[in-house]
Amino acid sequence: MKQAFRVALGFLILWASVLHAEVRIEITQGVDSARPIGVVPFKWAGPGTPPEDIGKIVGADLRNSGKFNPIDVARMPQQPTTASEVTPAAWTALGIDAVVVGQVQPGADGGYLISYQLVDTSGSPGTVLAQNQYKVTKQWLRYSAHTASDEVFEKLTGIKGAFRTRIAYVVQTNGGKFPYELRVADYDGYNQFTVHRSPEPLMSPAWSPDGSKLAYVTFESGRSALVVQTLANGAIRQIASFPRHNGAPAFSPDGSRLAFALSKSGSLNLYVMNLGSGQITQITDGRSNNTEPTWFPDGQSLAYTSDQGGRPQIYKVSASGGASQRLTWEGSQNQDSEVSSDGKFLVMVSSNSGAQHIAKQDLGSGAVQVLTGTFLDETPSIAPNGTMVIYSSTQGMGSVLQLVSTDGRFKARLPATDGQVKFPAWSPYL
């Protein structure tokens, strides 16, 4: 947890003030059929009201995962604050087999001691399945709640939690000197801050695997350019600004290389830069357009979009070049893919019969599942644990962010109030 604190501290030091209206998760489908769980309000052992409702944050995290449906406080048979106070039979009568209890205690030094226990009410009634405590300052309260959520989620599902992750996205505001903003927020929309403002479009943010940098496309020089910005100090490094198109950056899994698309020689083609030496290697060639690279987790291959067969489809190629292999066959066209961190599936924008939705393809069987039913869906990005996808869609006259689980059952949106929101990118574990 100390290492994760150091990563997040880089954000807090530089971006101390949170600006603009924040996005918030609004669940639209799937929570009612999720696994019920009890998350009891954490006991506050100080005067007045607590600075953060830790139990509420933990409950929201578990609900937002799409895998749990926390019971309403009004329906709770009891409100214990420690494992010894839990009456298992009272909870199992409501179909609940696990309960989270906890406490928040202010310290004389201005800090807070947060503790929780996850209690089994069914398999081995009264057994503590997981527990922890954190001593934090006020600015770390939400982070510590997300930490507890991660631990509870992993204990109950066997899947690493992703509640301490962030999302990057571009907001186009209405008017002003700098109508384009690259922003970063916690996965749930809280603690939003602005990374970069521009009078010209910003596009395609991509996280480095350690979460310390963002690559993106800017048009501030009058033409497209690829840059990498360090979040801790705001330093910007220009990667490519060739004639015509420079776009679609993607960091390799080890962070040593950056793949992108250039059209300096005519057609769009894939290139890879060694970020240490600055050497650029061309990966694809020919008259077709090849763009939107995404890395396989071994760092040896890329999936990408190509119209070499007439319409855009997803192909695979070695990161050192060579012959390509077509991956997608269903739908009139498929593009803008992202490979999951375990390499077992990819998500993509799939078009068929005039509809444009986010689809998932199993890379072993080739089976395809359409995940969304929203309008003009674009730019999917997968959570690092592979359970959720964030993407943008058209709603009314603008673009908003949407969430869908990778089984298609859970859906939510993250509406913004101060502009159109596009190009979401989910961070790695932080």
Curated annotation (Swiss-Prot):
Q: What is its main location?
A: periplasm
Give an example GO cellular component term for this record: periplasmic space
Q: Does the keyword S-adenosyl-L-methionine apply?
A: no
Please state where this protein is localized.
Periplasm
Q: Mind telling me which Gene3D superfamilies this protein's record contains?
A: TolB, C-terminal domain, TolB, N-terminal domain
| Keyword match Mitochondrion | no
Q: Which UniProt keywords apply?
A: Cell cycle, Cell division, Periplasm, Signal
Do you know which InterPro entries this protein is assigned to? Answer: 6-blade_b-propeller_TolB-like, PD40, Tol-Pal_TolB, TolB_N
Q: Where is the signal peptide?
A: 1-21
GO BP term (any one): protein import
Q: What functional role does this protein have? A: Part of the Tol-Pal system, which plays a role in outer membrane invagination during cell division and is important for maintaining outer membrane integrity. TolB occupies a key intermediary position in the Tol-Pal system because it communicates directly with both membrane-embedded components, Pal in the outer membrane and TolA in the inner membrane.
The family note in this entry says: Belongs to the TolB family.
- PANTHER family the record matches: PROTEIN TOLB (PTHR36842:SF1), PROTEIN TOLB HOMOLOG (PTHR36842)
Q: How does it assemble?
A: The Tol-Pal system is composed of five core proteins: the inner membrane proteins TolA, TolQ and TolR, the periplasmic protein TolB and the outer membrane protein Pal. They form a network linking the inner and outer membranes and the peptidoglycan layer.
Name listed for the protein in its UniProt record? Tol-Pal system protein TolB
Organism, by scientific name, is Serratia proteamaculans (strain 568)
Q: What gene name is listed for this protein?
A: tolB
